[in-house]
Amino acid sequence: MARRPVFQEVTETTPPGTTPSGGMIDAGHKGARGAIRLWLVVLFVMVAAMIALGGATRLTGSGLSITEWKPVTGAIPPMDAATWQAEFDKYRQIPQFELVNSDMDLASFKRIYWWEWSHRLLGRLVGLVWAAGFVFFLATRRIPTGWTPRLLLLGALGGAQGAIGWWMVHSGLSGEMVRVASYRLATHLGLAFAILGLIAWYVLALSRSEAALLRARRAGEAKLFSMTTGLMHLAFVQILLGALVAGIDAGRMYTGWPTMGGEWIPAEIWDATLGWRNFFENPALVQFIHRMTGYLLAVFAVVVFLRARRSPHPVTRGAYVAMLVALAVQVALGIMNVLHASPLPLALAHQIGAVALFTLILRARHHARYPYETSVRGTVR
């Protein structure tokens, strides 16, 4: 039998006009990746809306208006005067009413009730959209190989988020607490951003075939990816610190910038009676740390951006430009919040800005790991 030349074996293994299989991400029914990606985009938008609505609920002082956790029957709001009065009577028994809102009437209670009810309802809808989508894709065998655990993880984290939400609310229903515990608020918000980040990463992973991702990873920029990973973690820490600021209303203690009460380091930064609790309960220290971390985040982001400018991939460079623009807007919003004592519109814009910035950091990080190829003609692949 005649021998085949080595080069002939390599070049003729795959017949002309055919393409290699995409692998596990491309497994399943045709178009499954696109359908799952669309479902995840819907979930991403809903979770982002949850974060914004949660911020509005906190800023309007509405978070303790519903004093019970009823995951199923709680979806039905009060429908008559007697039920409304019963809900109001429950609220009147907690410290927030007794110490802060003792002059509140039923009409005012209804306004804060609707904020909290809407926030919880949206959470239930997120759970339903996840469950319906997961069951559908599982039943029709459209979930690509290896993706079932990832999608299940989203559902598990969503369930945990509901339980943590109640754990947070419960902290403000007894004793002398007139708001939820700040560290529980930070836990609740942190998990929300973790879920949002996971969904965003999955959406990006499903935007190309596995074969394309494998090719792209060979051209990935390890140093830039590592630096952006550090930036992502620092941004997450800053988000948690922002929750601590919000939890004790520390943003309104000092309304000057760049100094705090005319000092670079405020005299009230440490209360010896609080000890380690200064980091959670001392408004001066909490705001100071949030400011300093913000400066560090901004400087590090510029360093990462300058490194990204050396990337040979135009799409990657563009992703880092978008990230830096979002950071500049977020810094400006933070300063404006300080100067104007965090009015609701500005404070809400600052929280939405955090969502945008965190998402764009993740996007830039993904492009550093899986850059898009650009042909000689300038087309992106």
Swiss-Prot record:
Q: Which GO terms describe its cellular component?
A: plasma membrane
| Residues passing through the membrane, by range | 34-54, 120-140, 151-171, 185-205, 228-248, 285-305, 319-339, 342-362
What InterPro entries does the entry give?
A: COX15/CtaA_fam (IPR003780), HemA_synt_rhodobact (IPR054616), HemeA_Synthase_type2 (IPR023754)
- Which reactions fall under this protein's catalytic activity? Fe(II)-heme o + 2 A + H2O = Fe(II)-heme a + 2 AH2
Q: Where does the source fall among the domains of life?
A: Bacteria
Obligatory cofactor(s): heme b
EC annotation?
1.17.99.9
Q: Which family does it belong to?
A: Belongs to the COX15/CtaA family. Type 2 subfamily.
Subunit details:
Interacts with CtaB.
Record's protein name: Heme A synthase
State the organism named in the record.
Paracoccus denitrificans (strain Pd 1222)
